[in-house]
Amino acid sequence: MNKPLRNSHPLFKIANNALVDLPAPINISSWWNFGSLLGLCLIIQILTGLFLAMHYTADINLAFYSVNHICRDVNYGWLLRTLHANGASFFFICIYLHVGRGMYYGSYMFTPTWLIGVIILFLVMGTAFMGYVLPWGQMSFWGATVITNLLSAIPYLGMDLVQWLWGGFAVDNATLTRFFTFHFILPFIVLAMTMIHLLFLHQTGSNNPIGLNSNIDKIPFHPYFTFKDIVGFIVMIFILISLVLISPNLLGDPDNFIPANPLVTPAHIQPEWYFLFAYAILRSIPNKLGGVIALVLSIAILMILPFYNLSKFRGIQFYPINQVMFWSMLVTVILLTWIGARPVEEPYVLIGQILTVVYFLYYLVNPLITKWWDNLLN
């Protein structure tokens, strides 16, 4: 009997095993939709970015005005730009929910998948930071100056590294050109890393909400989860389009409507909202190098999860105290986001420092509490 083309064609077979005949746990909830939503976000960002790049000019004298030109003169340029800017926000909403799901349900026990996921998160954060610099508004310029300056905290190599990154003695034309170059290439590297992320995931199969082996009860990915994913796509696109058409500048910074001026510093230099929690952690350490280390660790600490797991059950569904701790940690991150947007003055400094300690303590104490709970029930 002839096999369907999707089972015999060498290229279609790969797609088929990943998207059609893939055995998926029957009980995965909507929390498992965010992987496909991130794929959709990445495609939206690459497509809108590609068309924006056709009209953008990476030159400090022209960048701000080329963005203005895109919004005023290019057909649907305003739509492309607002979709791209707000698409980044949705990308981060989905990525944080995706990571939170992985932490809650113990998906980090797929060690290679998890570690590649954290690397993807770093790459996406780097891409978003460089994209924020491109319109060359006040916050673009000063954000680039402040964040790249952090490299100078590295002992011995610091200043050389910063000047090498800038391509001169200050953030200038060379910096903008290279940031545009990297901003263009990185999403394609993220795309390649996503393929590897999926490759490792499909070696083990998906986790599920009860954290047990689901090999005895699996269903094909298509049509069940393809349609479930499409429902997620519709919901997300609806919210994104609503934001873009009703209040496109809601999540942006008003300072970025002012062309970059190296002689005037904005009153409050702050990144986009999705970096504020990390920015608050950076600011809460009085020492420059210590702040940089804390900033990197705020994300890199996710990498310890697979190696510091002491529980008998996968995830924290069956650990009530850990559930309370998890949601408290989420509140901590939200409060850090609020602190990141506040000026550096009391009581905000102290609150930020307390929240930073609480944030890092979660990762260290959480496995110990699961161990204690297991011993209690023995």
From Swiss-Prot:
Example of a GO cellular component annotation carried by this entry: respiratory chain complex III
Q: Which GO terms describe its biological process?
A: mitochondrial electron transport, ubiquinol to cytochrome c
Q: What does this protein do?
A: Component of the ubiquinol-cytochrome c reductase complex (complex III or cytochrome b-c1 complex) that is part of the mitochondrial respiratory chain. The b-c1 complex mediates electron transfer from ubiquinol to cytochrome c. Contributes to the generation of a proton gradient across the mitochondrial membrane that is then used for ATP synthesis.
Specify the taxonomic lineage.
Eukaryota, Metazoa, Ecdysozoa, Arthropoda, Hexapoda
Keywords on record: Electron transport, Heme, Iron, Membrane, Metal-binding, Mitochondrion, Mitochondrion inner membrane, Respiratory chain, Transmembrane, Transmembrane helix, Transport, Ubiquinone
Transmembrane spans: 34-54, 78-99, 114-134, 179-199, 227-247, 289-309, 321-341, 348-368
Membrane topology note: Multi-pass membrane protein
Other remarks in the entry: Heme 1 (or BL or b562) is low-potential and absorbs at about 562 nm, and heme 2 (or BH or b566) is high-potential and absorbs at about 566 nm.
Which organism does this sequence originate in?
Answer: Drosophila mauritiana (Fruit fly)
Q: Encoded by which gene?
A: mt:Cyt-b
Q: Where does heme b b562 bind?
A: 84, 183
Q: Summarize where a ubiquinone binds, as residue positions.
A: 202
- InterPro entries assigned to the protein according to its UniProt record, in alphabetical order: Cyt_b/b6_C, Cyt_b/b6_C_sf, Cyt_b/b6_N, Cytb/b6-like_sf, Cytochrome_b, Cytochrome_b_C_euk/bac, Cytochrome_b_N_euk/bac, Di-haem_cyt_TM
* Name assigned to this protein: Cytochrome b
